[in-house]
A protein has these predicted regions:
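A short, N-terminal amphipathic alpha-helix
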Residues: 24-35
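Conserved non-cysteine loop/helix-boundary elements of the Radical SAM core domain that shape
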Residues: 10-24, 42, 46-194
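N-terminal glycine-rich anion-binding loops that anchor highly charged ligand groups
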Residues: 1, 36-37
Length: 194
């Protein structure tokens, strides 16, 4: 698990949603939004969607079937090292339109120090593959990661521009309890940007 990750703390949920949960959420959203759903996407965030158990992932995507004509697309977030042609074929067949990659940094030393489990090269390769399939590409960046600095953050931003994604999300690093990053902070080994 990465140094800053704790999905239970981030989402406040200790359980995984079921396909029925997805259907009920989408049914309520469709009812609440009415015609505005035509401008809304179904989204699977809060982790690495393509890294979860394949049968579970497919069951969640199956739960979206009867709602696809009501929403303008499906957006997922995942890790760069969990993208390949097989997974993109599956996502395309289920109507996924946008894929956001949790790249976080384009400096390998920062990725390694934060236990990301992927390299900058995997961001380049998966981004190219995603774009070749016609998906909208989003890249996620975190500023102020452990072992990063302003220059490395600027390098990441400049590299993102070269990749030319459709969207970019920039997050500040937040220290969550019960993470390696919290331990580093408490031990005085990590100082967040002020």
């Amino acid at each position: 698990m990465c140094s800053f990750c704790n999905q239970n703390k981030i989402t406040g949920q200790a359980y995984q949603p079921t396909p029925l949960d997805v259907e009920q959420t989408l049914d309520k959203a469709a009812s609440d939004l009415g015609e505005r759903t035509k401008n809304a996407e179904i989204a699977f965030f809060g982790g690495s969607f393509t890294a979860i158990d394949r049968i579970y992932m497919l069951s969640l995507l199956d739960a979206t079937k009867k709602f696809r004509d009501k929403f303008c697309g499906i957006r997922i977030s995942t890790r760069p090292d969990y993208i390949d042609k097989e997974i993109l074929d599956i996502l395309k067949s289920y109507g996924v339109t946008s894929i956001e990659l949790g790249a976080q940094s384009m400096s390998d030393d920062v990725l390694f120090a934060n236990d990301r489990g992927h390299s900058a090269e995997s961001v380049f390769k998966s981004s190219e593959l995603i774009k070749s399939y016609g998906f909208s590409l989003g890249l996620q960046m975190m500023t102020g990661l452990y072992k990063s600095d302003i220059q490395k953050d600027l390098y990441t931003a400049e590299t993102f521009v070269k990749i030319n994604p459709d969207t970019v999300r920039i997050y500040p690093t937040v220290i969550m309890k019960d993470t390696k990053l919290a331990e580093l902070y408490l031990n005085g080994e990590y100082t967040p940007y002020s």
